[in-house]
Amino acid sequence: MSRRGTAEEKTAKSDPIYRNRLVNMLVNRILKHGKKSLAYQIIYRALKKIQQKTETNPLSVLRQAIRGVTPNIAVKARRVGGSTHQVPIEIGSTQGKALAIRWLLGASRKRPGRNMAFKLSSELVDAAKGGGDAIRKKEETHRMAEANRAFAHFR
């Protein structure tokens, strides 16, 4: 038995304005070079643009977008007998949300547009409607997992 205590599970803090953990997770992923105030500005501007575009609660659009992009299953490279197989594995909710946020930010960075707030708001609205690059990435991951279903027993 190990002598070390078990690490306490970290809970994500909520942001100051919306009091939402998802917004804080988004801020921490968009953060570059420790400029957290700039990250907050970008997120809040994006949420304001979503409010103007859709005339609905931006948090519900954000939740819907993340729910739509969150994958249930992913593939993991596993080396078996000299060859590497892509083994499908199930993903937990926390890891799925983290992946979804990463994909949303990656897709919004690749978008053409004026600034990051505009690109992020457009990507979130598209993802909430069921379109955009992040949704395509999720579907591609699910297709990969389905194609490699034969290797599921290598888990």
UniProtKB/Swiss-Prot annotation:
Xref: InterPro entries: Ribosomal_uS7 (IPR000235), Ribosomal_uS7_bac/org-type (IPR005717), Ribosomal_uS7_CS (IPR020606), Ribosomal_uS7_dom (IPR023798), Ribosomal_uS7_dom_sf (IPR036823)
Pfam families: Ribosomal_S7
Compartment(s) of residence: Plastid, Chloroplast
Signal sequence, renumbered to the chain: none
Listed GO CC annotations: chloroplast; small ribosomal subunit
Lineage: superkingdom: Eukaryota
Function: One of the primary rRNA binding proteins, it binds directly to 16S rRNA where it nucleates assembly of the head domain of the 30S subunit.
Protein name: Small ribosomal subunit protein uS7c
Species per Swiss-Prot/TrEMBL record: Lilium superbum
